[in-house]
Regions:
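An N-terminal assembly and electron-transfer interface module characteristic of large anaerobic redox
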Residues: 1-115
Length: 115
C-alpha cells in the first residue's frame, strides 16, 4: 500500500522567509542604484546584465491569484502560466516585477510573444 503524505516537512517553513529575504535584498539593491533585470527564461546569458552592473532576478508565477486581473486584458483560453505572469506584472503583486528596470522574456510560445 502506498503511504500518502499529508504534512509538509519542517524545512518548507523556511521558504516563506527566504522569499521575503530575497525581496528585501532586491529592494536594497534598488536603493543602492543597481539596475534590476527580470528574466522569464534560462536563455538569457546572465553575464550580459551582470557586465552592465545589473542584478538578475528570475520571474516566475507562483500562484493563480492574479489570473482574474490578467483576464481583463487577455483571452480566457490563454495558458494559465502566461495569465498569471502577466497578472503579477500588471498588479505589482510581485516585488521582482515591481523592481525590474527591464524584463527579458523568450518567444517560446504565442502567449509569451503577445505578453
Amino acid at each position: 500500500m502506498v503511504e500518502l503524505k499529508k504534512d509538509l516537512p519542517e524545512i518548507f517553513e523556511e521558504f516563506a522567509d527566504q522569499r521575503r529575504n530575497s525581496f528585501l535584498a532586491i529592494k536594497k539593491l534598488k536603493e543602492q542604484g543597481v539596475p534590476v533585470v527580470g528574466a522569464f527564461c534560462t536563455y538569457l546569458p546572465k553575464e550580459l546584465p551582470r557586465a552592465m552592473g545589473a542584478a538578475v532576478v528570475g520571474l516566475c508565477s507562483v500562484s493563480d491569484e492574479t489570473i482574474p486581473d490578467a483576464e481583463k486584458d487577455l483571452p480566457r483560453n490563454l495558458c494559465p502560466l502566461i495569465k498569471s505572469s502577466y497578472g503579477f506584472a500588471k498588479t505589482d503583486k510581485c516585488p521582482f516585477f515591481y523592481f525590474s528596470d527591464l524584463v527579458v522574456g523568450e518567444t517560446t510560445c504565442d502567449g509569451k510573444k503577445k505578453m
